[in-house]
């Protein structure tokens, strides 16, 4: 579907700036939707722009709808799809957020620090302060384990194979912390800025560390983890804050 972006843009009388905006929006759209358009994927895209400003959301919806109509006209699509402002991702009463497609988080990017921060939250359910406190000595990539030491205690967390290359890249030259400058950990604002820049670059502007952590919770629950097991993984004193995800 990406191959039709340029012919579509060429078919419209657009200024150079407008062409760049259309191209940027459509590349993100195609990245999330993929090659086969269906209602579920469109809802996924709708969810990804839900936290944008009203003007940005309207622009992206308009661009995507024009592109969808173009694809229908040239018979790439057998059915005509249209995104609307009122479309919402289906949610259950017990789950107040939808699981998003995170494939794009693992793709090559110039914003490698923000990417690794987001992946550590998505993969391990860490808080920003826990990410900031990761020490080089407590990362064992051979055995794929992270020993996390906090005021609440010590947790040993498994590292997925997909996470290892991202960690290897950032460990080079580090003295004490995974995220540091000459042995001094970066500030809380530094983490916030780098995470914000990365998620914005992949079309998830407004996706906070808290929302990323919620994605971890939803996926672990879906994988069959009990509320007690998940509470232990997250290092919580009690599972009370997780109850809303487990209510029937």
UniProtKB/Swiss-Prot annotation:
Biological process terms in GO annotation: DNA transposition
UniProt cross-references to InterPro entries, sorted A to Z: CB (IPR044068), DNA_brk_join_enz (IPR011010), Integrase-like_cat_sf (IPR013762), Integrase_catalytic (IPR002104), Integrase_recombinase_N (IPR010998), Tyrosine_recombinase_XerD-like (IPR020876)
Record-given protein name: Tyrosine recombinase XerD-like
Core-binding (CB) domain mapped to chain residues: 1-72
Cellular component, GO annotation: cytoplasm
Localization in the cell: Cytoplasm
GO MF term list: DNA binding; tyrosine-based site-specific recombinase activity
Pfam families the UniProt entry points to: Phage_integrase (PF00589)
Keywords for the protein's UniProt record, in alphabetical order: Cytoplasm, DNA integration, DNA recombination, DNA-binding
Active site: 149, 213, 245
Residue ranges of domain Tyr recombinase in the record: 85-248
Stated family: Belongs to the 'phage' integrase family. XerD-like subfamily.
Record bears the keyword Metal-binding: no
């Amino acid at each position: 579907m990406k191959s039709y972006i340029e012919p579509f843009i060429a078919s419209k009388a657009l200024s150079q700036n407008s062409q760049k905006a259309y191209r940027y929006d459509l590349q993100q759209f195609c990245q999330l939707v993929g090659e086969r358009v269906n209602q579920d994927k469109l809802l996924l895209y709708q969810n990804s722009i839900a936290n944008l400003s009203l003007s940005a959301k309207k622009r992206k919806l308009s661009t995507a709808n024009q592109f969808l109509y173009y694809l229908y006209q040239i018979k790439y699509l057998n059915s005509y799809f249209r995104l609307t402002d009122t479309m919402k991702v289906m949610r259950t009463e017990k789950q107040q957020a939808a699981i998003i497609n995170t494939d794009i988080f693992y793709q090559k990017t110039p914003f490698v620090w923000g990417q690794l921060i987001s992946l550590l939250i998505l993969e391990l359910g860490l808080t920003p302060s826990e990410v900031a406190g990761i020490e080089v000595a407590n990362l064992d990539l051979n055995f794929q384990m992270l020993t996390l030491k906090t005021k609440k205690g010590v947790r040993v967390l498994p590292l997925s194979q997909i996470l290892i290359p991202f960690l290897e890249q950032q460990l080079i030259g580090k003295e004490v912390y995974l995220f540091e400058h000459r042995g001094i950990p970066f500030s809380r604002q530094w983490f916030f800025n780098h995470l914000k820049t990365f998620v914005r670059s992949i079309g998830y502007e407004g996706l906070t560390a808290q929302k990323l952590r919620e994605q971890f919770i939803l996926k672990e629950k879906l994988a069959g983890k009990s509320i007690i097991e998940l509470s232990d993984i997250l290092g919580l004193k009690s599972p009370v804050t997780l109850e809303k995800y487990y209510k029937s």
